[in-house]
C-alpha cells in the first residue's frame, strides 16, 4: 500500500474523544488515558487520502509507520488541549479578539461557499465548458526550455556557444539562474499562448515564433536575459468535463462572487472618498 498522506488536524478542530468499546485493542497509553483503535479510526478516517483509491476499514490496514504517526498526532492533540486548559490562555483579551476574528472569517468563508453552490448551475457549467473547449480548438502548445542569465553579454556568449554546437541542456544546468528548470536541462514544460498565469508576454511571443529545435536570440524580461529553445509543438488536447471541472468551477465561482460583492457594495451605496488614481488602482 502506498504511503498515506496524513492531514494534521489543528488543536482547535479536535473532536471530543469518543467512548470506545472494550473489545477495541488498546494501541497506546499515556498518563491519565489510553488510545483504542476505534478512536483513531473515528478521528482520522474521514481525513485520509489514499492515492491508490483503496478504502481503509480497519486500523491494521494502515502501514506500521502511519499507525505510529496517527497515534502520536491523536495523543499530542489531547496533551496540547490539556496544556491550553491549564494555561487559561483562552481567557485573555487578545485571544478572544483573535477568536472572534477567526469566527468571522470562517463564517464569511462558509457564506461565500454556500452562495456559490446555490448559484452555480449545471447550465452555467456546460456553457462555460463549451466556451472553454472552443477557445482551445485549433490551438497549439509548445514544450520549451530556457537558460536565464543576468546580462545581455552572458546571453550572447551562451548563444555563440550554442551556435558552435554546445549542448543546450548542459549549458542550462551549468549557467541558468532558474534553478528549478536548470536541473532538468532548462525544460519549463508545455505552455499555451496568452494563457493567464503562465509566462511573461516577451518570453511567450518569442517562443511561439520559433520552430521545433530552434534556439532564440537573447530575450530580455524583468527576470533577466533568456535563451529559449522549442523542443516540441502539438495541438492542445481537449479535456473532458471531468478533467476541466476544477478549472471551470474556479472561473465560475470567481464570476459569481465578483457580482455578489458588487451587488452588496451597490446596496450599501458604497462611495470611496479617495483621489481617482488611488480608487482606480484599488479596483485592479
From Swiss-Prot:
Residue span of the signal peptide, if any?
A: 1-20
Describe the location of the PpiC domain by residue ranges: 139-232
Q: Does the keyword Isomerase apply?
A: yes
InterPro entries, sorted: PPIase_dom_sf (IPR046357), PPIase_PpiC (IPR000297), PPIase_PpiC_CS (IPR023058), PrsA_foldase (IPR050245), Trigger_fact/SurA_dom_sf (IPR027304)
Which keywords are on file for this protein? Cell outer membrane, Isomerase, Membrane, Rotamase, Signal
Q: Where in the cell is it found?
A: Cell outer membrane
| EC nos | 5.2.1.8
Q: Which Pfam families does the UniProt entry name for this protein?
A: Rotamase_3
Q: Name one GO molecular function term.
A: peptidyl-prolyl cis-trans isomerase activity
- List the GO terms this entry assigns under cellular component, sorted alphabetically: cell outer membrane
The UniProt similarity line reads:
Belongs to the PpiC/parvulin rotamase family.
User: Could you identify this protein by its name?
Assistant: Parvulin-like PPIase
Originating organism = Rickettsia bellii (strain RML369-C)
